[in-house]
Amino acid sequence: MNTAPKQYGFYMPAEWYPHERCWMAWPCHHETWSKIGLDKAKMAYARVAKAIAQFEPVTLLVNPGDEDSATNLCKGHNIEIISLPINDSWTRDTGATFLINNEKQLAGVDWIHNAWGGNYADCSLDNLIASHLIKCTEAQYFHAPLVMEGGSFHVDGEGTILTSKECLLNSNRNPHLSQQEIEQYLINYLGAERIIWLNMGLIGDETDGHIDEIATFIAPGKVLCLITKDKEDPNYHRLQENFEILKSSKDARGRTFEVYTVEQPPATYLNGERLTLSYINFYMANQGIVMPAFGYESFDRLAYQLFVQIFPGYQITQIDALDVFSGGGGIHCITQQQPKSYKLGE
């Protein structure tokens, strides 16, 4: 379908909208997990999948021949396994972006995936994941002629998009498009009205500053952003700038944001490289939040206490996620929610 979803009344709902399920993919890419090895990566993904499965069904995409390891680590936990050839395991970025309309019908956007600006040689199988998910869910299909990853934007479901210039305006994504043209694609394919641009993401983020590491919507008119109090940290000024932008911004409904902050954990290195650790990178499930812990007791505890405060009515589950982040992303990056919907004709 060549026309955009917004024309048909479709929009991406906020992540707190009820979910049908969560989609994940089983680790398989040796280069991605070279710091810790595939076995540890699989155990880390299993922890995330089982934590989410407390709240909603999880469907796990697994490379043919790797079903046994997924079954052994995830069996009996409200987790379905589907065999599908894949290159990597980041469904936030490679899976479909699901939309609904006012009749609660389901649609899916299939973006172009180029492995985060060409970081990896082969992403041909991952470029097919979105269309497979859309077919599996019997959703209405929309192809977007835009290189895009799901971790590069957040929505509030009420007309507002949050994203970063470092990623979306990067010359390794859509160099032929202007900022205005990219904005129009986002508005048309996510069913929105207004875009708030932050500038820079975390130092060393191989995704070029994905928004799901630095800021997110937590409720209508409310955002959570990452900060650091350490003025010597190279992230300090860029995170402070993001905070100031959010404080002075209004959403599509004209509300000035209520801005909450969570402090990033101390700088952590693995094989000489700093990991991009962030408590912002969590998954919001049905009545539950699955958030990371990094082994820093005071930072982990303060983040947990904040989440209890800002997510009333949700059960907060905090899990050891350092191994997930060693691959270059976090809990939000390895998950993709499918909103509850009615099938066409129901």
UniProtKB/Swiss-Prot annotation:
Name of protein: Putative agmatine deiminase
Recorded catalytic activity of this chain's protein: agmatine + H2O = N-carbamoylputrescine + NH4(+)
Family matches, as SUPFAM superfamilies: Pentein
Positions of the catalytic residues: C333 (amidino-cysteine intermediate)
InterPro entries, per the entry: Agmatine_deiminase (IPR017754), Peptidyl-Arg-deiminase_porph (IPR007466)
Similarity comment: Belongs to the agmatine deiminase family.
Keywords assigned by UniProt, alphabetized: Hydrolase
EC numbers: 3.5.3.12
Gene: aguA
GO BP: putrescine biosynthetic process
A molecular function (GO) term: agmatine deiminase activity
Top-rank lineage group of the source organism: Bacteria
One Pfam short name: PAD_porph
Top-level EC class: hydrolase
Gene3D superfamilies assigned: L-arginine/glycine Amidinotransferase, Chain A
